[in-house]
Swiss-Prot record:
<protein>
    <recommendedName>
        <fullName>RNA-binding protein Hfq</fullName>
    </recommendedName>
</protein>
<dbReference type="GO" id="GO:0003723">
    <property type="term" value="F:RNA binding"/>
</dbReference>
<dbReference type="InterPro" id="IPR010920">
    <property type="entry name" value="LSM_dom_sf"/>
</dbReference>
<keyword id="KW-0694">RNA-binding</keyword>
<dbReference type="GO" id="GO:0043487">
    <property type="term" value="P:regulation of RNA stability"/>
</dbReference>
<dbReference type="GO" id="GO:0005829">
    <property type="term" value="C:cytosol"/>
</dbReference>
<keyword id="KW-0346">Stress response</keyword>
<dbReference type="InterPro" id="IPR005001">
    <property type="entry name" value="Hfq"/>
</dbReference>
<dbReference type="Pfam" id="PF17209">
    <property type="entry name" value="Hfq"/>
</dbReference>
<dbReference type="InterPro" id="IPR047575">
    <property type="entry name" value="Sm"/>
</dbReference>
<comment type="subunit">
    <text>Homohexamer.</text>
</comment>
<comment type="function">
    <text>RNA chaperone that binds small regulatory RNA (sRNAs) and mRNAs to facilitate mRNA translational regulation in response to envelope stress, environmental stress and changes in metabolite concentrations. Also binds with high specificity to tRNAs.</text>
</comment>
<comment type="similarity">
    <text>Belongs to the Hfq family.</text>
</comment>
<feature type="domain" description="Sm">
    <location>
        <begin position="10"/>
        <end position="70"/>
    </location>
</feature>
<dbReference type="GO" id="GO:0045974">
    <property type="term" value="P:regulation of translation, ncRNA-mediated"/>
</dbReference>
<dbReference type="GO" id="GO:0006355">
    <property type="term" value="P:regulation of DNA-templated transcription"/>
</dbReference>
Amino acid sequence: MSKNTINLQDNVLNQVRKNKITVTIFLVNGYKIRGLIKSFDNFTLLMEVNGEQQMIYKHAVSTIIPGKTLNLFSDQSDKNDQEQ
């Protein structure tokens, strides 16, 4: 990947984690999980659900729905404006 490539997955996960936005996650088996993303890596999500931690493997995730609209490209456009 080039240096300027935007990683949408990491941007979404970072924004909901940093802003403590509640997410609803649907797994491939249809199970629904609602909570906060505390951390993530290439393979897993660590969530806080009802005061308890759950580690979820990304390959089991079907859909992630943030509790509010995200502004994904504001940080990237601010960086581009500063570089010019």
